[in-house]
C-alpha cells in the first residue's frame, strides 16, 4: 500500500502544480473566501445523535480502484437528494479523477441539490487543495493520516480551520490514531479496510474505538452494509458511519439509506 500511496501522491503533486499554474494560490484563496456560507458538518452529525439517531455520511461515488465502475447511471444531484430524503446527515463526494472517476463539479452539484453539508473526499496534501474544496462548496475535508506527515496534517488542519471547515481525520491503526488525536478536530474516522490486503473487517473499529476519547465523534468507514452492522458498532460507541459503495449499488438509494439507518418511511395521512 505504501507504493500505491506514493503513486497517488506523485500524480496529486502534479495535479496541484498544474492547478496553481492555472489559478494561483492567492486567487484560489479569494474564491474560497467568497464561497457559499459553510454548513456545519460536525454539527449536522451531532444533531442526529441528539435526536437519538445514527448519523450517516452518505458517499457519492462513481468508481473505485479496486472495484472499477460502481454505478453507471451516475447523477450526483439525484443521488444526493435521495440520500437526504433517506435520512443522511451529510454528504461525501469523490473529487479524485484518476482513481475514482470523481470531479469537482460532482461536489458542487450534489451539495447544491440538498441542504446537507458536504465533504471533499480526496487525497489531500497541500493547503491549496483546501482552498479548492471550499471554493467548490465543500464544508469539510478528509485528512488520511497514512498519506501525510504530521507537518502536512497540521498545515491542512490549520487552513481548514481558518476557513471554518470541519475535518475528518482517517486512521487505520493505533499509530495513526495517536497522531490524529494530537490534532484538534473532533471527527475521527476509523477505516475498516486493511491497507495491505484491502480486506475489510469491523474488528478494526471494535479494536480502535475504545482508544478514542469520549469528546470525539468516531466515524466508522468501510465494511458497513446493513443496519445490523450499525448496531454492532454502536456497542463500541460508534453511531456515525460513512457509507458509499453498498448504497451506490442499490436501485432505490433512498430506501436503501432508510434501511441502513433503521428508519421507517414517513406515511402522510390522507384526508
Swiss-Prot record:
EC number: 4.1.1.48
InterPro entries xrefs: Aldolase_TIM, Indole-3-glycerol_P_synth, Indole-3-glycerol_P_synth_dom, Indole-3-GlycerolPSynthase_CS, RibuloseP-bd_barrel
Gene Ontology MF terms in the entry: indole-3-glycerol-phosphate synthase activity; phosphoribosylanthranilate isomerase activity
Pathway: Amino-acid biosynthesis; L-tryptophan biosynthesis; L-tryptophan from chorismate: step 4/5
Catalytic activity: 1-(2-carboxyphenylamino)-1-deoxy-D-ribulose 5-phosphate + H(+) = (1S,2R)-1-C-(indol-3-yl)glycerol 3-phosphate + CO2 + H2O
A Gene Ontology biological process term: L-tryptophan biosynthetic process
Pfam families, sorted: IGPS
The organism's place on the tree of life at top rank: Bacteria
PROSITE patterns: IGPS
Keywords: Amino-acid biosynthesis, Aromatic amino acid biosynthesis, Decarboxylase, Lyase, Tryptophan biosynthesis
NCBIfam families registered for this protein in UniProt: PRK00278.1-2, PRK00278.1-6, PRK00278.2-4
Family per record: Belongs to the TrpC family.
PANTHER family: INDOLE-3-GLYCEROL-PHOSPHATE SYNTHASE, TRYPTOPHAN BIOSYNTHESIS PROTEIN
Name listed for the protein in its UniProt record: Indole-3-glycerol phosphate synthase
Native source organism of the sequence: Chelativorans sp. (strain BNC1)
The organism's taxonomic lineage, starting at the top: Bacteria, Pseudomonadati, Pseudomonadota, Alphaproteobacteria, Hyphomicrobiales
Gene name for this UniProt entry: trpC
Amino acid at each position: 500500500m505504501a507504493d500505491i500511496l506514493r503513486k497517488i501522491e506523485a500524480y496529486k503533486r502534479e495535479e496541484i502544480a498544474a492547478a496553481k499554474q492555472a489559478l494561483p494560490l492567492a486567487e484560489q484563496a479569494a474564491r474560497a473566501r467568497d464561497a457559499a456560507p459553510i454548513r456545519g458538518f460536525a454539527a449536522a452529525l451531532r444533531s442526529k445523535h441528539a435526536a437519538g439517531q445514527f448519523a450517516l455520511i452518505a458517499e457519492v461515488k462513481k468508481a473505485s480502484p479496486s472495484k472499477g465502475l460502481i454505478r453507471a447511471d451516475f447523477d450526483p444531484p439525484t443521488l444526493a437528494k435521495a440520500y437526504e430524503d433517506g435520512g443522511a446527515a451529510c454528504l461525501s463526494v469523490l473529487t479524485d479523477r484518476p482513481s475514482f472517476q470523481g470531479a469537482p463539479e460532482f461536489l458542487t452539484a450534489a451539495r447544491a441539490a440538498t441542504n446537507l453539508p458536504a465533504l471533499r473526499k480526496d487525497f489531500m496534501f497541500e493547503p491549496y487543495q483546501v482552498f479548492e474544496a471550499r471554493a467548490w462548496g465543500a464544508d469539510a475535508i478528509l485528512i488520511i493520516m497514512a498519506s501525510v506527515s504530521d507537518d502536512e496534517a497540521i498545515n491542512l488542519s490549520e487552513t481548514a480551520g481558518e476557513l471554518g471547515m470541519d475535518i475528518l481525520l482517517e486512521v487505520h491503526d493505533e499509530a495513526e490514531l495517536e497522531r490524529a488525536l494530537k490534532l484538534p478536530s473532533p471527527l475521527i474516522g476509523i477505516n475498516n479496510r486493511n491497507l495491505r490486503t484491502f480486506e475489510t473487517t469491523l474488528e478494526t473499529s471494535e479494536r480502535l474505538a475504545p482508544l478514542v476519547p469520549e469528546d470525539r465523534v468516531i466515524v466508522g468507514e468501510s465494511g458497513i452494509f446493513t443496519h445490523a452492522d450499525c448496531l454492532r458498532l454502536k456497542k463500541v460507541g460508534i453511531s456515525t458511519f460513512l457509507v458509499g459503495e453498498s448504497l451506490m449499488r442499490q436501485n432505490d438509494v433512498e430506501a436503501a439509506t432508510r434501511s441502513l439507518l433503521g428508519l421507517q418511511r414517513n406515511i402522510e395521512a390522507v384526508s
